[in-house]
Amino acid sequence: MKFTGPLVPATLVQRYKRFLFDAILTDGTAITGSCPNTGSMRGLTTPGSRIWLSEHDSTTRKYRHMLEIVEADGTLVGINTGLPNRIAEEAISAGQVSNLDSYDTLRREQRYGRNSRIDILLSDAEKGLAYVEVKNVHFSRLSGLAEFPDSPTERGAKHLEELGDMVAAGHRAIMLYLVQRDDCSRFRICRELDPVYARAFERASTRGVEAYAVKCQVSPLQIVATGPMMVDEAVPAVL
């Protein structure tokens, strides 16, 4: 997924109220921008961090700049939760997700379950339906290990339950964890930060929900999926 224009480098001053951040551009200009990530962004909001911003001239936007990338421990990390579905679609089409590249049709944001929308719905005359829920992953505490979630997510647990219902109805259901950083080779569910989600993940797995993780290469020009990652069991990490 290529950005529509070159990203603007800056230095993070603070991120606050979930939706906002202050930064200093390279010419010394102080700006306030929007943050397209309402999660905790644990480990990615350190003042002084190098960041990259997209620019938007639309008169419908209150802020011209939007946060896209944060540098953490020398690694570029994509934080925009509005991008993973597009990146996942490219990854599936490129055959980077096990057994999902040969479906006839791919549709996004389709209604299903209990008044929910599935991120990607694959359909095929012979294979039937495959429901794909995409989660953005940017959290890493241990070298080489990406984790999700970085804070409690009731909505995420609900999605796992609904995916299990799709399996019970005779369809495939897949959790696709899109890791927007390239310094990790393994992925796990973070039981310590959300034990409820971890239990929901285990229940979904026993019901037949599949789980895959895909690594991304992040740059100020584009974010592209580069291939699958190992998914570890949801056991406590040793810090």
From Swiss-Prot:
Superkingdom to which the source organism belongs: Bacteria
Disulfide-bonded cysteines: none
Pfam families found in the cross-reference section: SfsA (PF03749), SfsA_N (PF17746)
GO molecular function, one term: DNA binding
Residue ranges of coiled coil: none
Transmembrane segments: none
Entry's family note: Belongs to the SfsA family.
PANTHER family named in the record: SUGAR FERMENTATION STIMULATION PROTEIN A
UniProt-recorded name of the protein: Sugar fermentation stimulation protein homolog
Gene encoding the protein: sfsA
